């Protein structure tokens, strides 16, 4: 590893050889790997790479301070050395002391003739497997940005192309979209939401185009006059009263126009309306608002509903009793009316002259009396309260 170790007595197996693909170490720098080709067949096809590689190895060995070997020491190893693989044959480099051969061999690829350089460069560029070490040797490679930006052949071809015959230019498209400078051949309109064409290709506005499409004729330019109201029709007058103003024109049996009043009078009475009934002003019906009528109807129904229960139901809470004759009451203070008198009073009640009422007398109830009378009330089902 150091110069003292490299110059040992065993010269048959040197630690490092300038031919072998091993590492060269220096005391003050990281290890440097000297690559050698592991494909002899490819190196034979590319001899200029072999020369460059050999000269490069010799150059590194000559610059190393610890290696001062001669030509005799370069052949010291034999084929049985474990450091050298037996499957590959290596060509030995020239002596290190021959500086002219070393420099010439190292600089030979750089000073190569133009023909040789182009030959190797073209071969490498065309195959595509091994790129050339120099970017300028390929004759087929175009110069980078030789012309100005955006001046390539593709851009020139795009700019040189003629527009397709079916395409519309931008100016024509804008004119087609906005429709500036157009005029309807029918009505002379200059602006319309949509321009249309007639059968001959002339421009029509949207209204004229739709009218022509639906009716098959040109749209009339003169607007139709508004229809006069029935009360102001020109040239019409009632054949009976000779008035010219009416809310509705009618016709008599002969088909002559009559006013609304004369027509209704003739329809209802069968005779012409007398002229004495003619009025200068048209009498209109005074219609009542519908909301007021509905309000009155609702209030009337509510009042009738409120009055009807009072007439049917009796507000007096006094009960009416019906008793049988010759039966005494078990309740003290209860007045019993005979059946005959009750029936007569019932007839009077129907007539509305008299009313049968239960009038209790003022007395005080005692608990003993209530307990004694509770049993007969439960047993006798024909009592006055049960029969009522």
From Swiss-Prot:
The cross-references to Gene3D superfamilies, in alphabetical order and at most eight, read:
Erythroid Transcription Factor GATA-1, subunit A
Q: Where are the zinc fingers (GATA-type)?
A: 184-208, 238-262
What's in the GO CC field? Answer: nucleus
Q: Name one GO biological process term.
A: positive regulation of transcription by RNA polymerase II
List, as start-end ranges, the regions of compositional bias called Low complexity: 297-315
Give the subcellular location.
Answer: Nucleus
Indicate, by first and last residue, each region the UniProt record lists as having compositional bias (Basic residues).
284-293
Composition bias, Polar residues: 76-101
**Where does the protein principally reside?**
nucleus
List, in alphabetical order, the Gene Ontology terms for molecular function in this entry: DNA-binding transcription factor activity, RNA polymerase II-specific; RNA polymerase II cis-regulatory region sequence-specific DNA binding; zinc ion binding
* Disulfide bond entries: none
Which residues does the annotated region (Disordered) include? 76-113, 280-333
Tissue specificity comment: Highly expressed in heart and throughout the gut, with lower levels detected in lung, gonads, liver, and gall bladder.
User: Per its UniProt entry, which superkingdom is the organism in?
Assistant: Eukaryota
Q: Which UniProt keywords apply?
A: Activator, DNA-binding, Metal-binding, Nucleus, Repeat, Transcription, Transcription regulation, Zinc, Zinc-finger
What PANTHER family does the database record attribute to this sequence?
TRANSCRIPTION FACTOR GATA FAMILY MEMBER (PTHR10071), TRANSCRIPTION FACTOR GATA-5 (PTHR10071:SF289)
**What is the name listed in the Swiss-Prot or TrEMBL entry for this protein?**
GATA-binding factor 5-B
Q: Which species is this record about? A: Xenopus laevis
């Amino acid at each position: 590893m150091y110069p003292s170790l490299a110059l040992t007595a065993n010269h048959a197996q040197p630690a490092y050889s300038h031919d072998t693909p091993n590492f060269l170490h220096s005391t003050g720098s990281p290890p440097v790997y000297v690559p050698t080709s592991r494909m002899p067949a490819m190196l034979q096809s590319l001899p200029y790479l072999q020369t460059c590689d050999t000269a490069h190895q010799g150059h590194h060995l000559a610059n190393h301070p610890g290696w001062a070997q001669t030509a005799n020491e370069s052949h010291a190893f034999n084929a049985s050395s474990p450091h050298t693989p037996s499957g590959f044959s290596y060509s030995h480099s020239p002596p290190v002391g021959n500086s002219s051969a070393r420099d010439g061999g190292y600089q030979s690829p750089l000073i190569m003739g133009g023909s040789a350089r182009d030959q190797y460069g073209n071969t490498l560029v065309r195959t595509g497997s091994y790129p050339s070490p120099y970017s300028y040797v390929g004759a087929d490679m175009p110069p980078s940005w030789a012309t100005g930006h955006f001046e390539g052949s593709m851009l020139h071809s795009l700019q040189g192309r003629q527009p397709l015959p079916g395409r519309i230019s931008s100016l024509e498209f804008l004119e087609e979209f906005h429709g500036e400078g157009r005029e309807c051949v029918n009505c002379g309109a200059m602006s319309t939401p949509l321009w249309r064409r007639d059968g001959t290709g002339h421009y029509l506005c949207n209204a004229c185009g739709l009218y022509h499409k639906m009716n098959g004729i040109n749209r009339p330019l003169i607007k139709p006059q508004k229809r006069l109201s029935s009360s102001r029709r020109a040239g019409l007058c009632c054949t009976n009263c000779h008035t010219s103003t009416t809310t509705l024109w009618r016709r008599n049996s002969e088909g002559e126009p009559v006013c609304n009043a004369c027509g209704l009078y003739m329809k209802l009475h069968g005779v012409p309306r007398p002229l004495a009934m003619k009025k200068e002003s048209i009498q209109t019906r005074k219609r009542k608002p519908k909301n007021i009528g509905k309000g009155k109807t609702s209030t009337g129904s509510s009042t009738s509903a409120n009055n009807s229960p009072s007439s049917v139901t009796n507000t007096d809470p006094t009960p009416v009793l019906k008793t049988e004759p010759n039966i005494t009451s078990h309740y003290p203070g209860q007045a019993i009316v005979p059946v005959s008198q009750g029936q007569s009073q019932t007839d009077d009640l129907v007539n509305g002259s008299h009313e049968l009422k239960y009038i209790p007398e003022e007395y005080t109830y005692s608990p003993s009396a209530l307990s004694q009378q509770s049993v007969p009330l439960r047993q006798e089902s024909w009592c006055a309260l049960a029969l009522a």
